[in-house]
Curated annotation (Swiss-Prot), chain A:
Swiss-Prot/TrEMBL keywords: Chloroplast, Membrane, NAD, NADP, Plastid, Plastoquinone, Quinone, Thylakoid, Translocase, Transmembrane, Transmembrane helix, Transport
Residue ranges crossing the lipid bilayer per the database entry: 1-21, 30-50, 63-83
Single biological process term from Gene Ontology: ATP synthesis coupled electron transport
Catalytic reaction list: a plastoquinone + NADH + (n+1) H(+)(in) = a plastoquinol + NAD(+) + n H(+)(out); a plastoquinone + NADPH + (n+1) H(+)(in) = a plastoquinol + NADP(+) + n H(+)(out)
Molecular function terms, GO-annotated: oxidoreductase activity, acting on NAD(P)H, quinone or similar compound as acceptor; quinone binding
EC identifiers of the protein: 7.1.1.-
Origin superkingdom: Eukaryota
Protein's recorded name: NAD(P)H-quinone oxidoreductase subunit 4L, chloroplastic
Organism this protein belongs to: Marchantia polymorpha
Quaternary structure, from the entry: NDH is composed of at least 16 different subunits, 5 of which are encoded in the nucleus.
Annotated function: NDH shuttles electrons from NAD(P)H:plastoquinone, via FMN and iron-sulfur (Fe-S) centers, to quinones in the photosynthetic chain and possibly in a chloroplast respiratory chain. The immediate electron acceptor for the enzyme in this species is believed to be plastoquinone. Couples the redox reaction to proton translocation, and thus conserves the redox energy in a proton gradient.
Compartment(s): Plastid, Chloroplast thylakoid membrane
Curated annotation (Swiss-Prot), chain B:
Gene3D superfamilies assigned: NADH:ubiquinone/plastoquinone oxidoreductase, chain 3
Membrane topology, record value: Multi-pass membrane protein
Family: Belongs to the complex I subunit 3 family.
The encoding gene: ndhC
Alphabetical list of InterPro entries matching this protein: NAD(P)H_OxRDtase_bac/plastid, NADH_UbQ/plastoQ_OxRdtase_su3, NDAH_ubi_oxred_su3_sf
Superkingdom of the organism of origin: Eukaryota
Family matches, as Pfam families: Oxidored_q4
TM ranges: 7-27, 64-84, 89-109
Organism taxonomic ancestry: Eukaryota, Viridiplantae, Streptophyta, Embryophyta, Marchantiophyta
Primary role: NDH shuttles electrons from NAD(P)H:plastoquinone, via FMN and iron-sulfur (Fe-S) centers, to quinones in the photosynthetic chain and possibly in a chloroplast respiratory chain. The immediate electron acceptor for the enzyme in this species is believed to be plastoquinone. Couples the redox reaction to proton translocation, and thus conserves the redox energy in a proton gradient.
Keywords: Chloroplast, Membrane, NAD, NADP, Plastid, Plastoquinone, Quinone, Thylakoid, Translocase, Transmembrane, Transmembrane helix, Transport
The name this protein goes by in its record: NAD(P)H-quinone oxidoreductase subunit 3, chloroplastic
EC numbers: 7.1.1.-
Organism: Marchantia polymorpha
Biological process per Gene Ontology, one example term: photosynthesis, light reaction
Swiss-Prot record, chain C:
Main location: plastid
Entry protein name: NAD(P)H-quinone oxidoreductase subunit 2, chloroplastic
Record bears the keyword Translocase: yes
Taxonomic source organism: Marchantia polymorpha (Common liverwort)
Highest rank taxon of the organism: Eukaryota
Transmembrane segments: 15-35, 40-60, 82-102, 107-127, 132-152, 167-187, 212-232, 244-264, 278-298, 307-327, 333-353, 378-398, 410-430, 466-486
Family: Belongs to the complex I subunit 2 family.
Amino acid sequence: MLEHILTLSAFLFCIGVFGLITSRNMVRALMCLELIFNAVNINLVAFSNFLDSSQIKGEIFSIFIIAIAAAEATIGLAIVLAIYRNRKSTRIDQFNLLKW
Amino acid sequence: MFLLQKYDYFFVFLLIISFFSILIFSLSKWIAPINKGPEKFTSYESGIEPMGEACIQFQIRYYMFALVFVIFDVETVFLYPWAMSFYNFGISSFIEALIFILILIIGLVYAWRKGALEWS
Amino acid sequence: MKLELDMFFLYGSTILPECILIFSLLIILIIDLTFPKKDTIWLYFISLTSLLISIIILLFQYKTDPIISFLGSFQTDSFNRIFQSFIVFCSILCIPLSIEYIKCAKMAIPEFLIFILTATVGGMFLCGANDLVTIFVSLECLSLCSYLLCGYTKRDIRSNEAAIKYLLIGGTSSSILAYGFSWLYGLSGGETNIQKITNGLLNAETYNSSGTFIAFICILVGLAFKLSLVPFHQWTPDIYEGSPTPVVAFLSVTSKIAGLALATRILNILFSFSPNEWKIFLEILAILSMILGNLVAITQTSMKRMLAYSSISQIGYILIGLITGDLKGYTSMTIYVFFYIFMNLGTFACIILYSLRTGTDNIRDYAGLYIKDPLLSFSLTLCLLSLGGLPPLTGFFGKLYLFWCGWQSGFYLLVFIALITSVISLYYYLKIIKLILTKKNNEINPYIQAYIITSPTFFSKNPIEFVMIFCVLGSTFLGIIINPIFSFFQDSLSLSVFFIK
């Protein structure tokens, strides 16, 4: 049973990384970031259910990860808002000011 | 299917449900009369005349409220474990939770004073 | 399990410096909210005072035996104390650097100070974190503040772009790190304390499994992103170029120091069962970053980008001490970090001063600066030469100790490449210095012409110049007294948790 959950979280992780690499829109990239964090959460909750059911440290850890992911998403969206105000677009591939 | 013995019922239900949904949709397609007209293509807004386009831009205000909401919504999650084990910890944890809420309140006051909660 | 939540009164002294900073940032926030009239001198005063108090407390307590507090989630020893005081020291130097820049860019001051203080607190907690949860939370506390600081000039598109790039890449790296943490949590049988994880891995005999290897790779990738080692360095030049310059000065030292402390703790305590494995990986990363950082830095045209690549190569040198792994190696690493603060902040102080007066960062616009401002060009020259490691200056002695320790421990290839690349680095530093000092007749570029000459009196100098002169003095003369410094750091590091077994 544990293997299935771990496989699920590994798939979610891979989808998240793939999406981060390929997505053109910034909001979509932020969503992929959330996917990776959710993969971590699934892993932690599964492990804490199977191995550590008395102290449930993993679930506490996942609460912290949820809170921090929310803060990160909020900061990301705020920066997206600032970018949108300045250049009326949120596409990643149009960010080419900083290059060598 | 051999690995997940507990899920046999689930798969039976899944089969039945998918069978029923296909059956019902094909029945309605077979029975219902087919009309074509301009009314068919308008969006459905609870029976009222639709106003404007389906893809409208939301006010940017909603966005600001959503940003503030997300932060405070998630921070309250930390209070649930504390509340569940309140009787085990005694008065000191109560004071610590008060400090935590106080910091959140300072954040809320900050958002308020900086005008993130103003609509106009 | 009975929880002792009033342990704060027992262990309060272990996090007292951090508590002072948190308290002062709350005070700054409340002052900003209650008084609409902006009296900014007070805000600077409060932040600098709290930083000073906390560094004094840290210096008084620097020789402590390892104490584990807060249910095993925080550990205090002399190694952490030294790195924490480095971080506070950087913040003390960086706040005067940013005063005039903020005034010119018309940014809000209280938020800037709050972000700087929060990042400092996050870095300080990161140095002593002993628990996976604490490591993750304090790491994010540091990096979330850094994203906000990068995008602090909201109207500037380049700053926005740097912020979003930093956010995406930093978020990716910390999520990969968290994925590695989740595997460690599972493989050790449900432990989050890093000493208990090692015991759990040894007891469950999973320390050689492929799962541990995946966790190790994930954690190493996350750390390498934070330290900007070479295959994971792509974000550094972009962020250095786009962000406001005082913020870059702050990030280039603080996040490096905190990341280095974290890497040392994780690799030494968590992966203490396979030291040869991580040393090989780190060696490859260090060699790559020394070679690529120095080679790419030659071709740069922007000063900030050049410094970004040079910082990538510097972190490669610093890693030699970590790879060496004995007391002398750690001591020389700590000393080099200490010198690096002076050299790097001194260089950045010069750049901030120049860009405030002319508004450009290009290297070629520095041509002929010597005619207009000898003080600035002299200090820039000294800092750059010290970064390159020319003999009588501080950077030379730091590098000498690092390379000598590496050579004695038998890392010949590493030290050999480090020697060659530091010669290459001298080339591009000298190129800039030649540009500054040589005078092309009748062809002064417009930026230099627009340069405002400062008043020669001593008291009318601005805070940036004070910091600049202080750092230049440090990066010139500290090398002479390296022997007492070395024995001082060696004494205190020998009390740290890595050497008390």
